Amino acid sequence: MALLCSALSNSTHPSFRSHIGANSENLWHLSADPAQKSKRRCNLTLSSRAARISSALESAKQVKPWQVPKRDWFPPEFMFGAASAAYQIEGAWNEGGKGPSSWDNFCHSHPDRIMDKSNADVAANSYYMYKEDVRMLKEIGMDSYRFSISWPRILPKGTLDGGINHEGIQYYNDLLDCLIENGIKPYITLFHWDTPQALADEYKDFLDRRIVKDYTDYATVCFEHFGDKVKNWFTFNEPHSFCGLGYGTGLHAPGARCSAGMTCVIPEEDALRNPYIVGHNLLLAHAETVDVYNKFYKGDDGQIGMVLDVMAYEPYGNNFLDQQAQERAIDFHIGWFLEPMVRGDYPFSMRSLVGDRLPFFTKSEQEKLVSSYDFVGINYYTSRFAKHIDISPEFIPKINTDDVYSNPEVNDSNGIPIGPDVGMYFIYSYPKGLKNILLRMKEKYGNPPIYITENGTADMDGWGNPPMTDPLDDPLRIEYLQQHMTAIKEAIDLGRRTLRGHFTWSLIDNFEWSLGYLSRFGIVYIDRNDGCKRIMKKSAKWLKEFNGATKKLNNKILGASSCCSGVTHGGGTA
């Protein structure tokens, strides 16, 4: 999710927790104890939440034919694909020469901090079954596949001095060959949260400036070995979530600053300062990497950017203060990383409210940062209303997400929710928000070319959801995708003509970070009781129809490549 969820994977997502004083009805002011989350989340009883989801299911059955998007609504060059992330799908955590990652360490050391106490040691077994993933992409008719490379699978110790793992190089070359032979365009994310554990042990990874050189070296190895096959790169995935969850709340890796039982014991000073240090070093690593790419590897057709998680905040009430809260929420959520790449510094609101906890860029760093992207990826799942919090001496921030002085609310001042509950506890479907944020980014950030790099919703086991009788029947996901594709078309019609593609999150069910396997975002079901067998859900079959893949299959395009003749990985042989 890439949780979210892909990155948006926990109800204490950093953009959600903020000071509320005595307001006990705030959605996101929750105990870190999972049992308390499930009791208090969304201020709904389990039965009332189940009723709302059942109502949404009935609504999903009533989508009119003229509301269903068509592929020919979009320009011919507009890409449709699916996405995944290495840690969430590959498995083989200690095989093929791979070194441990921060997430390996997190899950093994603190299994109680994963909802179902699971880990991604096997995940969807894509290290061995990548050919089945490509087969699914081909059968669904996808143009493209966004996936991430595991840094510790390439550099097991995190550094060039520690040696390159050529088995890892071979694995990704085999995957790339299989994609290209089947007409599927690869989009690579260089970092999707799985830091080499060796760097955490040596110098606390992104809290130290040394990460800039080590990350740039790692990226250069990837450019060197895969650059002839890959022309579209993303340096980082969802830095906002990575910084907040990993170094603010500690609910994601590295997470060593939280004790067993999900009780967060991060010192307030660290929770207020460290996310900004990590974000700053991440931006410097991005700028250095893009500089190397542009000088030595870009060529005539290479492109590079960053993936941001976004929300289209709306004012909680029709008043000036909530409108200002909306602007601050966007600054802290999107502008934190995009404004330095557009104008060389953080948003003014962040400078004002964070003060000396927010690092400064040198002139040379600013020069490298500005325009350090050819495109921007945005991961969009849902939105919230922004409610103003008074800025006063009585309020003392406890964690970095308090700095925004804006509460994210599901309901507006009249009690109207931002959208229907679509099965995943934090996702309320609001396709208008996607259109709004696409238009806002055109006005506020210089109209960058954009890919929607993640968009989708999840099936949940438990947590107030109706019992899932058929994991392949996912009408809410179909409706969600249809409505958001329609919103993209509307944005294009309103002048947002630099949109380049849409990637559904996710291709297959995977390990969804702190939710383990309780949350399933895939359009393809993974049967973990039958060797991780891949089975298309109804949403995949709808996308197959949308992409016109049935006609292609009738013309025997599927399976034309020998790379899909088997399902195992081993030096490229099946």
From Swiss-Prot:
Q: Which GO terms describe its biological process?
A: carbohydrate metabolic process; defense response
* Residues engaged in binding a beta-D-glucoside: 88, 192, 237-238, 381, 454, 505, 512-513, 521
Tissue-by-tissue expression: Expressed in caryopses, coleoptiles, primary leaves, and etiolated and green seedlings, but not in roots.
- This protein's UniProt keywords: Chloroplast, Disulfide bond, Glycosidase, Hydrolase, Plant defense, Plastid, Transit peptide
pH-dependent activity? Optimum pH is 6.0.
State the disulfide connectivity: 258-264
Q: Write out the catalysed reaction.
A: avenacoside B + H2O = 26-desgluco-avenacoside B + D-glucose
One Gene Ontology cellular component term attached to this UniProt record is: chloroplast
The residues annotated as the active site are: 238 (proton donor), 454 (nucleophile)
Which cellular compartments is it found in? Plastid, Chloroplast stroma
Recorded hits in Pfam families, A to Z, give: Glyco_hydro_1
Regulation of its activity: Inhibited by N-(3-Dimethylaminopropyl)-N'-ethylcarbodiimide hydrochloride (EDC).
**Transit peptide boundaries:** 1-55
A GO molecular-function term, please? beta-glucosidase activity
Q: What is its EC number?
A: 3.2.1.188
The protein's superkingdom reads Eukaryota
Q: What does this protein do?
A: Beta-glucosidase acting as a preformed defense system. Hydrolyzes the bisdesmosides avenacosides A and B to 26-desgluco-avenacosides exhibiting fungicidal activity. Can use beta-fucoside > beta-glucoside > beta-galactoside > beta-xyloside as substrates, but not alpha-glycosides, beta-thioglucosides and disaccharides.
Extra facts: Long fibrillar homomultimers are formed by linear stacking of trimeric units. The multimerization of the enzyme promotes formation of a long central channel with narrow openings at the sides. The active sites are localized inside the tunnels, constraining the accessibility of substrates and products.
Family designation? Belongs to the glycosyl hydrolase 1 family.
Q: How does it assemble?
A: Homo- and heteromultimer with P60B in a 1:1 stoichiometry. Aggregates to form the fibrillar stromacentre.
Q: What is this protein called?
A: Avenacosidase 1
Give the gene that encodes this protein.
P60A
